[in-house]
Structures are given as C-alpha cells and as structure tokens.
Curated annotation (Swiss-Prot):
Name of the gene this protein is made from: proB
Listed name of the protein: Glutamate 5-kinase
A Pfam family hit: PUA
GO terms for MF: ATP binding; glutamate 5-kinase activity; RNA binding
Domain PUA per the UniProt entry, residue ranges: 275-353
GO BP term, pick one: L-proline biosynthetic process
Record lineage: Bacteria, Pseudomonadati, Pseudomonadota, Gammaproteobacteria, Enterobacterales
PANTHER family for the chain: GLUTAMATE 5-KINASE (PTHR43654), ISOPENTENYL PHOSPHATE KINASE (PTHR43654:SF1)
Binding-site residues, substrate: S50, D137, N149
C-alpha cells in the first residue's frame, strides 16, 4: 500500500515478558525502534500494551501472581505508571511523544463515550503522538472489563480508523493445530473469511501467558476485518516484523478485510463489548438469519445480564451459538417482562412501549 498508513500494534504479556516474570526490556526496545522507524516514515502508530500487572509485580518484588482481584488491581495501579513511563522513555529517544488512554468496557459500549474516545485518538494521531492503550486494570472488575487486549486492540483499530492491526504473539501465526504438541501443524498464511472450522482450530490453541489465546485473536480479527481493517497475527520476535506488515510482505497469518466494510455505527455495534445477552427460539433464529427480520419479544426465551435501553447485547440460539449483536430497545428488566409475549402486549405489561421490536434489524449485525 502506498502512502501513509495507520497501524495498530498489540503486544501481549507473552511478547512483553518473553514468558518470564519480568518485562523483557531488550525486546521492548527493539519493537519501539521498529515502530519509531515507521513513524519517521510518515505512518501513524498506535500501541495496545499489556504488562501493567507484570510491571507492578516486578517493581514490588511479588514472587508470583496473587489470586485476589484486589491484589491484581494493586499491581496494575503500581505497574501502569511504570509501564507508560517506559514507553515514553523509549519513544523519546526518537523524539516521539506518547499519550496514554486507559479504557474500560463502559467507555466502548456507550456510543457517546465511544465517539469521545475516537476524538481523543484522532487528536493524538493528528499531532504525531503515539497513543498507548491499555485496559484500566486498576479499576476494572469482571463486569466492566473488555476481557482481553486482543478484542481491545480491534476496538482501538476502529477508533483509529486503522488500515492494519498487527497482533504480536509468541507464535508465527495461526496454525492448523497447536504446533507445540502436533508436529504436523501447518501455518495458515491467508484467511479470506472466518468460519466455524477456523474457530474450532483457534479454540484449541493458546498463546503463551495472559488472558488472550488464539480464540480471542480470531474474535478480534473478525471485528476488525468487518470494519475494513486487515489483521496480521505474527511472532513478536521476528526481525523487522513491523516494517514487513507496513510494506505488505508475507508474514504470519493475514486476515483480509471485507471488501464492503460495515458503516461506522454498525462497526461500533459489532465491536462493542455486549452488556448482556438474550437467548431466542428457533422461530426467531429463522426470522433473523433467513428473512432478515427484527427480533420480536415473542421469540425471546432467556435474558442474561443487567443492561440499559440503547446498549449493545448479544443474541444467541438455544444451543448457545452467537447469532448477532444488536442495540436493545428495552432495558434488561423490561426485556424479561415482555419475553415470550406478543408485541401488542408490551404496553399493557410495561405501561409504556418503545415500539414493537426488542432489537430492530437496522440496529443488528449478524455474527
């Protein structure tokens, strides 16, 4: 690709630590050098970094990872400042400033806050500042976490209007099987569509330490590709990997972006972490998947989670398979009350109504 590109580089815990209990500074120095080189060439670079808890554990001398959430958040609070200091220190060698963005799921599932985050990202990039993004582990609980930095990086790529998303890992890419216990495993070079067979392969493989395995990388690739962003999974240890991706050289596993990407609002719907989920019956599945219809309350069998009207929810069939993401017309309490009922009963049950559908087709993205 000619001209300036926007590249999001995601570095997981296994890449930043080399599988040890400490940050691998020599490796981080080399990756910063590669990113700075592309920044100097006119490209826009975004970093999505793990490692706050590892940095905190190293600084405080914890011999192993504590089990309690409070202790992990303590380490994240200590480590986050040291982590951003490290990124600033290393990029400053090349005369580059960084800007920290700490996000939680709440920043991304709310449309207005999502747009505010996008404006911040744009301002940083327009001023030639490298955004350094991480989940706000010091305050994030299970209920407000995105969950892993793979999916966070896909959302960051959407926020940045990126051309490419590079997921650096401790493997060469996505294999047909786990190469560490199957010598017949082969590297998958090109992916033009993510199907159930590929999901099954990724679900059985892991990527070093941290919360993100190959399954979460595949989820991230699905979100980003639907937004028109190419995704590359490659080894962080490969020399010149950042330049290779910018220049379009074959490296790792490349997931090709959809030729007709989703429009901006639907990118948010598909990428936003769901605030809850609903299970629907076979009739609703047929209406959504075969006829392209809205979801009516009659087809809802179960409602999980606590969500507000206007938040993104996941829609699943009776076997638990993901069907779609959509914006809920009713909050979770109201959805439970009207589930299984005909649309004309909504007003009588609730005393009000926001229309006959639970999720409108225009506010829905099929998985």
């Amino acid at each position: 690709m000619n001209g300036s590109q926007t590249l999001v580089v995601k570095l997981g815990t296994s890449v930043l630590t080399g599988g040890s209990l400490r940050l691998n500074r020599a490796h981080i120095v080399e990756l910063v050098r590669q990113c700075a080189q592309q920044h100097a060439a006119g490209h826009r670079i975004v970093i999505v970094t793990s490692g706050a808890i590892a940095a905190g554990r190293e600084h405080l001398g914890y011999p192993e990872l504590p089990a309690t959430i409070a202790s992990k958040q303590l380490l994240a609070a200590v480590g986050q400042s040291r982590l951003i200091q490290l990124w600033e220190q290393l990029f400053s060698i090349y005369g580059i400033h960084v800007g920290q963005m700490l996000l939680t799921r709440a920043d991304l599932e709310d449309r207005e806050r999502f747009l505010n985050a996008r404006d911040t990202m744009t301002a940083l990039l327009d001023n030639r500042i490298v955004p350094v993004i991480n989940e706000n582990d010091a305050v994030a609980t299970a209920e407000i976490k995105v969950g892993d930095n793979d999916n966070l990086s896909a959302l960051a790529a959407i926020l940045a209007g990126a051309d490419k998303l590079l997921l650096l890992t401790d493997q060469q890419g996505l294999y047909t099987a786990d190469p560490r216990n199957n010598p017949q495993a082969e590297l998958i070079r090109e992916v033009h569509g993510i199907d159930d067979a590929l999901r099954a392969i990724a679900g059985d493989s892991v990527s070093g330490l941290g919360t993100g395995g190959m399954g979460t990388k595949l989820q991230a690739a699905d979100v980003a590709c639907r937004a028109g962003i190419d995704v590359i999974i490659a080894a962080g240890s490969k020399p010149g990997v950042v330049a290779d991706v910018i220049e379009g050289k074959p490296v790792g596993t490349r997931f090709h972006a959809l030729e007709t990407p989703l429009e901006n609002r639907k990118r948010w719907i598909f990428g936003a972490p769901p605030a809850g989920e609903i299970t629907v019956d076979d009739g609703a599945v047929d209406a959504i998947m075969a006829r392209g219809s809205s979801l009516l309350p009659k087809g809802i069998r179960e409602v999980k989670g606590d969500f507000s009207r206007g938040e993104v929810i996941r829609i699943r069939n009776l076997t638990g398979r993901d069907l779609a993401h959509g914006v809920s017309r009713y909050n979770s309490d109201a959805m439970r009350m009207i589930a299984g009922h005909h649309s004309q009963e909504i007003s009588e049950i609730l005393g009000y109504e926001y229309g006959p559908v639970a999720v409108h087709r225009d506010d829905m993205i099929v998985s």
